[in-house]
Amino acid sequence: MEANGNSETGINPFVSNLSILNIFFSLSLTVFSFGIVIYLENNAISVLYAGVGLTLGQIILLGTSILQGRAIDKGYSFQLMVTGSILYGAVLFLIYFTVSIGYIPSLLIIAFIPLMLVFEGVFRSSLNAFIAKAAAARALGKNYSRILTSEAIGSALAYVVMVYGAFSLSLSLVFVSSSILLVFIALLSFFFLRSRERDIMRKAESSVRRPGFRESIRNLSSKKNFAIPLITSKAFMTIGIIGFTFFYVPTGVYLGISPEYSFTFLLITYLLAILIGKYGEKVLDRHQGFGRGFVSLNMMFDVITYGLVVLSIIYRVDYLFLIAALFASPGVLLVSGAMTYEVGVIGRESRGMFGGVQRQFIGVISAFVSFPLTYIFTRNPSYMWGIIFAASLISFIITFTIPSAFPSTGAVPVN
């Protein structure tokens, strides 16, 4: 049973509403991320344009992330969620429209991909911050799990669509329909449904103390022993996310595996993630002190995933490549726990600024690696995956340098 709006232990119905929106956002995001390379190749557009677009997008994020973080800490996360979700769907539609009419698509793709990254960041960061500030502290992990489970549902739907729509009908049709659905659901979610519960959460968000810029910086500086290793670990993890998201399916094609098989195993992965996420709400309630363990386990599964991909390429073993995706399924539980731990240490009032600093650092790494990874993939996919595996291993090792207890915040995770 759903809890009422002011429950200290349950999930506000508006979070369930946001979960529905997140399903369609994840559907559009997955269609774009896993389909853009194939979409470009099908329309005789060089994949390198995507690499240039990714790099430009990360550079733009460097300039906007701190400003967005300050806006979040000033209480504008709801407005940013609305803006990010609607504009993301609009730009996805423009990509379809531009490519379909053949109007200088190569140049416009370079412009559109950065916009997709920026609006994705606007929505995701604002959504996570809104939950952190507006949800009851004792139910924070449960709320995050609900949001991330909906993300898994959206991704699973996207893989079904990609298998039975993109290849049976048209990838263009998938792009345009998912973009229109996203904009429609966003308008419903934010302006027409669950208005009472929405207002309760917005009031809860506005009640969180709003520190000034200097105070936010001082707060983060006092947590540098936590923030520096965590952000560094995430930066190396991001290299793997970029590679897996954009090049897992094309790598399967390189190995002679049809996209339908790759998408089917990705679908199975996210179906497992949905089950784990549903069970994870109870796990997070019972193990709120596990803290750093969630971070380390999450990075460990990345190492396993990318290691299996590397082995599959070296030894040309198809089933290793397909099975590798399945090890991403515990991510819903582990990321929910890690995010709850993060908020407990950093504090709700500084969540936006921490996210901004984090995106700055990660953006630098992403800007440097996006185009090189794309270029290396076009030359030899095995080299690219070797780099990704090494980065994931470094990320995993760094997690053990994160302190395990923070008495000043009350967050005392267990190793």
Indicate residue ranges for each PLM-predicted region.
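Intracellular juxtamembrane helix-capping segments at the cytosolic ends
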Residues: 122-135, 333-347
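Cytoplasmic helix-loop-helix junction between adjacent transmembrane helices
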Residues: 113-151
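Juxtamembrane intracellular "pre-TM" segments in multi-pass secondary transporters
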Residues: 1-12, 195-232
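Hydrophobic core of transmembrane alpha-helices in multi-pass small-molecule transporters
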Residues: 23, 105-123, 319-334
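Helix-to-loop junctions at the C-terminal end of transmembrane segments
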Residues: 64-77, 276-290, 377
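C-terminal ends and interior cores of transmembrane alpha-helices
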Residues: 86-103, 300-315
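A late C-terminal transmembrane helix in Major Facilitator Superfamily
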Residues: 349-378
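Helix-loop boundary and gating motifs at the non-cytosolic
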Residues: 5-59, 226-233, 237-256, 262-266
